Regions:
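Coupling and communication elements adjacent to P-loop NTPase active sites across diverse families
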Residues: 1-54, 66
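ABC ATP-binding cassette signature C-motif
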Residues: 38-242
Length: 242
């Protein structure tokens, strides 16, 4: 009997917390993003792409990204998802096959690892060439404490560092947004804000995220990466070879 009452109390407490969170979400100032319009149809394309670090992570991947795509790159850990994103933003990644971007394509990239951040957010805004006022406004919408603005980012929590990277990306006007595990260490309120933003603004995006609900709510295209064979699916199935 006592155990049943204890369980009931925990359930009531969890329900109250959820209701309170939903009220906070409704009151929260909405995030905004201003993507650049793309002049053509094709943003990026991969054909027979293979990535190998001594041994192949995957082979023969083909896909394309178009204006309006919010594509989730999915697959098991270590299968090469982050390597594809890094290759697409111009980093050196050992590969064969073709991965091309539209000429003049502007990309905004949020890497998975934020440990490199250091200095104050003011210094960071200056280095990145973004509007400091807008940057700070977005951080505050993420419930980022003002007291942190003057502190060294090296001492930030993982969630605070990820919010810095996301806020910087939201400040940037780009044709394509590439985000690697954007929800890592992020609180629930900020997660819902991001989900709502992407559902209403619909920027062209390629992202990696292990949160299945976020993928289901956000993506209109899924590139499923497997070692053998790669495949592409989506709400409107498209040929994998473009």
């Amino acid at each position: 009997m006592k155990r049943a009452k204890s369980i009931e109390k925990r359930q009531e407490k969890a329900l109250a917390q959820k209701e309170g969170l939903l009220k906070n979400i409704e009151k929260a100032d909405e995030l905004r993003i201003t993507p650049l319009p793309w002049r053509g149809r094709l943003l990026a394309e991969a054909r027979e792409l293979s990535i190998s670090y001594g041994k192949p992570l995957f082979e023969g991947l083909s896909f394309f990204l178009e204006e309006g795509d919010r594509a989730a790159l999915t697959g098991p850990n270590g299968c090469g998802k982050s390597s594809i994103l890094r290759l697409l933003v111009g980093e050196e990644v050992p590969h064969t096959g073709m991965l091309s971007r539209g000429r003049g394509l502007i990309v905004s990239y949020v890497p998975q690892d934020a440990s490199f951040l250091s200095g104050t957010v003011q210094d960071y805004a200056l280095r990145e060439g973004i509007d400091r006022s807008l940057f700070f406004t977005i951080l505050r919408k993420f419930d980022f404490p003002r007291s942190q603005f003057e502190k060294d980012m090296a001492g930030y929590s993982g969630g605070q560092k990820k919010k810095v990277l996301l806020a910087r990306s939201l400040c940037e006007r780009a044709h394509l947004y590439i985000w690697d595990e954007p929800l890592n260490f992020i609180d629930l309120l900020s997660r819902v804000q991001i989900e709502r933003l992407l559902g209403t603004a619909s920027p062209a995006m390629l992202f990696v995220e292990h949160d299945r609900r976020f993928v289901e709510q956000t993506a209109n295209k899924v590139i499923a990466l497997r070692t053998q064979p790669p495949a592409e699916t989506g709400k409107d199935p498209l040929p994998a070879n473009g």
